[in-house]
From Swiss-Prot:
Organism of this sequence: Pseudomonas putida (strain W619)
GO molecular function: DNA binding
Name this protein carries in UniProt: Sugar fermentation stimulation protein homolog
Gene3D superfamilies recorded: 2.40.50.580, 3.40.1350.60
Source species, domain of life: Bacteria
Amino acid sequence: MVFFPPLEQGRLLRRYKRFLADIELANGEQLTIHCPNTGSMLNCMREGGQVWFSRSNDPKRKLPGTWEISETPQGRLACVNTGRANALVEEALRAGVIRELAGFTALKREVAYGEEGSRVDFRLEFDHGPAYVEVKSVTLGYPDTAVAAFPDAVTQRGAKHLRELATLARQGIRAVQLYCVNLTGIEAVRPADEIDAAYARALRAAVADGVEVLAYGARLDAELIVIDRPLPVLLNP
């Protein structure tokens, strides 16, 4: 995924009301930009740290700027626009980068499924049957470790998705939880038991029921983001 034009850079002053952030440009101009992230953004940002944002030319938008990338307290880069994850994964799927899911004949987005009224991010059609793929964006890192964690806040919705996938797996239908790691300097992923123990239990239960768990890391900068490598998932604390 190429940013065109390339992202603009600023310095974070504050994030507030979940969806707003004030930044300062190099020339001293201050802007309010949209924050497209409903999570806690734990360890994803710091006041005074560098941020990169895209700018829309749509005159109907109240806030033309959208926060895309943040400098973390550990000096990493994190893509904080969670809406990018599905597009990145689709791009990687179509390019054959995600080897475990290569060879599909059709791809459908946001397909209704399950007993709890969910929509799966992708349904892939293979000659031998479908695969249901749920995507989660991972941006939580910690100091002195290259292991990222998910989630960064309690997510009942995330646990519901795991239950839905587990139900499919028990029926013999291929079900995949895919973590898109939009954070530099990461070598593995784990469930964040310390933040949401219920989600971590649901993940381990889903794996026991046959759900596949994959993680792929992304390379990112102000010009592009691209999924480029598989990462191990560490299920045991």
